[in-house]
Amino acid sequence: MHPPYTAPATEEAVTRVIEFFENLSPADVATIGQFYAPQARFKDPVNEVVGVPAIQGIFAHMFEALEQPRFVVTGRVVQGQQCFLTWDFLFAFKDFHKGVTQTVRGASHLVLDAQGQVTLHRDYWDAAEELYEKLPVVGALMRWLKKRANS
């Protein structure tokens, strides 16, 4: 059995989405509709929304809450109308550990329509290890629980 054919247009659409996210700035949030279908679904460990305005809200909040957030795509697999991306999300907290670059490693599953727009964006990352352990009070508790579970 052969894998589904991946049209060159899908490869090009994925490349455009990657370039968009790797160069995302606060001003670019308003242009998300150029890459996402109107009723696109977005889900990650802390959000689940439908529609371009709601997706824009997630990324606008990211820029409000964090210093210099940016994505670096480290790998991609495109098959048919889907792709799977691995990435590093780099940022600094505004309220504590100021100026210290944090990294969250994760992956995204994207499904594109015939026009090359994202209809499903599902992010996978370990909220406990990648985020909560880096927070002052919660982080100490998470690290203690992890240590107890591993002993």
Predicted regions mapped to residue ranges:
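A general secondary-structure boundary signal
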Residues: 14-15, 30-36, 86-88, 108-111
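A solvent-exposed, acidic/Ser-Thr-rich amphipathic alpha-helical stretch
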Residues: 29-33, 37-83
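A beta-strand edge to alpha-helix "cap/lid" segment located at domain peripheries
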Residues: 2, 64-70, 74-151
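Exposed alpha-helical structural elements
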Residues: 12, 16, 31, 54, ...
